[in-house]
Every structure is written in structure tokens, then in C-alpha cells.
A protein has these predicted regions:
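M16/MPP (pitrilysin/insulinase) zinc-metallopeptidase core fold and M16-derived inactive scaffolds
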Residues: 1-39, 82, 105, 215-230, ...
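M16/insulysin-pitrilysin zinc metalloprotease superfamily fold
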Residues: 4-9, 38-71, 215, 235, ...
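Scaffold signal of the M16-like zinc-metallopeptidase fold and its non-catalytic homologs
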Residues: 5, 80-129, 149, 240, ...
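Stable alpha-helical elements in mature extracytoplasmic
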Residues: 10, 14, 45-48, 65, ...
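Short acidic/His-enriched helical or mixed secondary-structure segments at domain edges of catalytic enzymes
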Residues: 72-88, 172-186, 225-231, 242, ...
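An aromatic/glycine/proline-enriched structural segment found at the starts
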Residues: 99-106, 128-129, 133-196, 297, ...
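C-terminal regions of mature proteins
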Residues: 133-137, 251, 283-376
Length: 376
């Protein structure tokens, strides 16, 4: 959409207009949203809004630019096997979310089949006043902003808001999934569906994630990398959305220590259910998280964008302000309870990428396992 021109301008003309005014216009896409960021000086604010309006309301999706974007994305996918960590996380995500939209990443086949008409139809169905939110920060007043937005976007008509997609349910534990690659290192990912931002468990899960794998003092780093010396990269990821989240513990290790690292990771995940975290560790995690949160909102743009995304996700208006309070209220008992609830071994997804002929122990020691053919 950004590089494909508009009904009023060819792609090159649109690029020239942006360059002449030193306008930075960026479009990115997540699983839930299309994000447009416009940065411009005060002198060219009106001109930039015209360009933004044309791109948002009447994109051209120029065939040549569309084909270029398609080829770039396909080449990225073809190179994915050269990135073992990226490939493992792609397959883990598909297994964790299964048939939900979050479990259907782009494939070479889907990109090959994409047409300009598909893009235009997607735009007609999903981009309209009923689905778009705009946040503005800078040297303009609220009144001036409302007037300018009304002037440039007031005539926009379109479809009604999109019906939200149902959150995925946690998959029951199945076999350990194995991706064969003749590489000297293995990638291990063990994860679960977790609580969303609107869950009472969100703050405790955030703290638990940080303690288990969020820094140099985390349990996984201290045990697997520092004490055992078996991983060049290890940690956890907790990615909360509004109604659900995803938690994953990961490690990259030599082929000859793959099973040992799987055992250690599983042991750490079980330990936070069995024993309370000590007060010093809990205090360290809470302080680190609250300080990081504060430094994430130093500019007016960061605050405006954060508030808009909260509104987009249907979160309370004071969600950002209450975050430190929620983190600091987490107790050791909360961590044990959340670990028992969300790290249930009966709902666990495990993916291992590597060369099983070089593993220290067979994967069968962890139960049934199945080789996975990666479908790019």
C-alpha cells in the first residue's frame, strides 16, 4: 500500500512528493492490525495529510510494485531454512495456534496466488472510518487536529467495523515435534497459550516470564547458559494480546546436548510451580519491569501511540498508568498459581529443530515424537 501509489499519483510521483517534503510514511502489518506512521514537520502537516488520505482511501496497488513486493517476500521465505531459529518459531506458532488466523502465516503458495484484486478487496473490506483509529502528537492543538482530520478524511465512507476473531484455545499436549536439519546446533521451543492483557493473571505472568527467562539473572540464563554452559542463547518470550497470549521458553544448544537442555528447560518450568520464588528475585523482577515500562513512554508520540493501541485492543483508558501498580502487587504466591494454571504440562507444545543423529539422547525419552515437514 505504501509503495504502490494512489489513484491520483503513480508510485514514483508519490515517492517524490514524500521526499520533497521530507515526510516519513511507514506501513507495517501485525497479526491484528495495519499500522501507519507519519512523521512530518509542522510546515508540511497539511500536505502530508493529503498524501496520507490518498494512500489510505484510494491506494493504487500498482501491479509492478505489487510483483516486486511479492518477489521480495517469497525470497525471504525461501531463505528461512538458513535461519534455524526463525524457522523453528514459525512452525511452533503454527502448532500452538493451529487453525486460528494466528496459526496461518504467509506461504510461498499463498503469495504466488495473491492478486491485485485481492489487495483492493482487502482494502475495501477492512479499511474504513469504522475500523481506523488515528493518534496525533506534536506542535498542534486538539482543536486544530480535529479540524484538519475532518477536512481531509470527513468524506470517507466504508464498511462497518470488523467482527473480532475468537481467541484460540490451548492445544492439548501432543507429540514432541521434530524438524530435521543437518546443522551443528539445535533449536528448542517449549510453550503454552497464556493469559491476555485483560486477564487478572496478566501481571503475574509478565513477572513470571521475566524471572524464568527475561534477563541475565533469569533462571534459564543462570542454569543453562552460566552454570551448565550449554546454550549460546536461551530465555523466554511472553507475547500478550487482549484476550490471550503466548508464552515460550527457548534455547539454542549444540546437537550433542539437545536432550539435556530439553530436560533442564522442562525442569525449570516445573520448578516455578513447585517452589515459591524468593523475595529478592521477585523484587528484582518487579523493579526491572516497572523501570522498563517508564522508559518506554518518554515522548509524546510513544504515549499517544500506546493510548491508541489500548483503545484498539479494548483495554481500560488507564491501562498504561496502572501497569506499574499491577506489577508491584504481584506476590510469590501469585507466581506459583499462574505457573500451575498456564504452564500445565497437559497443554504444552514442544518443537525441536536439529540433527537427531547427533543428539545426546533419543527424543523418545520425552514420549511420542513426530517429524514435521516445514511447509513454506
Amino acid at each position: 500500500m505504501r509503495t504502490g501509489g494512489t489513484q491520483a499519483m503513480s508510485p514514483d510521483e508519490f515517492d517524490d512528493e514524500l521526499d520533497y517534503r521530507a515526510v516519513d510514511l511507514d506501513v507495517s502489518v501485525t497479526a491484528e492490525a495495519l499500522l501507519v506512521t507519519l512523521t512530518v514537520t509542522e510546515d508540511y502537516f497539511d500536505d502530508a495529510l493529503v498524501l496520507l488520505r490518498d494512500m489510505m482511501m484510494t491506494p493504487l496497488f500498482d501491479p509492478e510494485r505489487l510483483e516486486l513486493a511479492r518477489r521480495i517476500r517469497i525470497e525471504e521465505l525461501k531463505r528461512l531454512p538458513d535461519n534455524p531459529q526463525g524457522l523453528a518459531f514459525r512452525e511452533f506458532t503454527k502448532l500452538l495456534y493451529r487453525d486460528s488466523p494466528w496459526g496461518r502465516p504467509p506461504s510461498i503458495a499463498s503469495l504466488e496466488a495473491l492478486t491485485r484484486e485481492d489487495c483492493l478487496d482487502f482494502h475495501r473490506r477492512l479499511l474504513s472510518p469504522g475500523t481506523v483509529m488515528i493518534a496525533v502528537s506534536g506542535a498542534v492543538t486538539a482543536g486544530e487536529t480535529q479540524a484538519k482530520l475532518s477536512e481531509h478524511f470527513g468524506s470517507w465512507r466504508g464498511a462497518a467495523p470488523v467482527t473480532p476473531v475468537t481467541a484460540p484455545s490451548p492445544p492439548e499436549s501432543g507429540p514432541l515435534w521434530y524438524i530435521h536439519r543437518e546443522v551443528p546446533q539445535s533449536v528448542i521451543i517449549i510453550g503454552h497459550i497464556g493469559p491476555g492483557k485483560n486477564s487478572a493473571d496478566h501481571y503475574a505472568m509478565t513477572v513470571l516470564d521475566f524471572i524464568v527467562g527475561g534477563g541475565f539473572r533469569s533462571l534459564m540464563f543462570l542454569e543453562i547458559r552460566t552454570r551448565m554452559g550449554l546454550a549460546y542463547s536461551t530465555g523466554t518470550v511472553y507475547n500478550p494480546r487482549r484476550d490471550f497470549g503466548a508464552f515460550a521458553a527457548y534455547a539454542m544448544t549444540g546437537s550433542g546436548t539437545t536432550a539435556t537442555v530439553i530436560e533442564s528447560t522442562l525442569s525449570i518450568l516445573e520448578s516455578v510451580k513447585a517452589r515459591p520464588v524468593d523475595e529478592e528475585t521477585l523484587r528484582w523482577a518487579r523493579n526491572a519491569l516497572t523501570n522498563s515500562h517508564i522508559f518506554s513512554f518518554l515522548s509524546s508520540h510513544q504515549v499517544a501511540r500506546g493510548q491508541m493501541m489500548n483503545e484498539f485492543e479494548g483495554l481500560p483508558p488507564d491501562f498504561l498508568r496502572r501497569y506499574p501498580e499491577g506489577i508491584n502487587a504481584v506476590t510469590a504466591e501469585d507466581l506459583q498459581r499462574v505457573a500451575a494454571t498456564w504452564l500445565d504440562s497437559g497443554y504444552r507444545t514442544i518443537v525441536t529443530l536439529g540433527d537427531s543423529s547427533r543428539f545426546d539422547k533419543p527424543l523418545s525419552r520425552f514420549g511420542a515424537f513426530r517429524e514435521l515437514d516445514s511447509d513454506l
